[in-house]
Amino acid sequence: MDQTLSNFGNVFAFLALGVVFVAGGYLTARMLRPSRPNPAKNSTYECGEEAVGSAWVKFNIRFYVVALIFIIFDVEVVFLYPWATVFKQLGEFALIEALVFAGILVLGLAYAWVKGDLDWVRPTPNIPKMPEMPSGKSGALRG
């Protein structure tokens, strides 16, 4: 029990020192840096060209879906790499565990594919319009 607490104490001390070093560096830089704002420093820099328009551009949500799927499978590789290095020592049970892990991810990919989340060009939905009222007003209900 003492050895386990000692190991957790080492991890906690390592994390605490990491936070102290990051916060200390940030605070030291903030206190020592000169503050001389001017229009040239506050403008957006784009490869030496003057910025045109707004930087807030709407991106298609499909880019995010593709990026998330890439990250999921990239993390899968990170998890499977250590397993692959000691594959012969772990035996059959570890192989089954890795196959189940990969299978769950493949099922998730198949679900996203069947749902249509991976289709780059989606058909526009055909939404029927409300019939117009005889008085010329739209389909709003009157009370």
From Swiss-Prot:
This is NADH-quinone oxidoreductase subunit A. The gene is nuoA. It comes from the Bacteria. It comes from Pelodictyon phaeoclathratiforme (strain DSM 5477 / BU-1). Belongs to the complex I subunit 3 family. GO terms for molecular function: NADH dehydrogenase (ubiquinone) activity; NADH:ubiquinone reductase (non-electrogenic) activity; quinone binding. NDH-1 shuttles electrons from NADH, via FMN and iron-sulfur (Fe-S) centers, to quinones in the respiratory chain. The immediate electron acceptor for the enzyme in this species is believed to be a menaquinone. Couples the redox reaction to proton translocation (for every two electrons transferred, four hydrogen ions are translocated across the cytoplasmic membrane), and thus conserves the redox energy in a proton gradient. The lineage of its organism: Bacteria, Pseudomonadati, Chlorobiota, Chlorobiia, Chlorobiales. It is an enzyme of class 7 (translocase). Its EC number is 7.1.1.-.
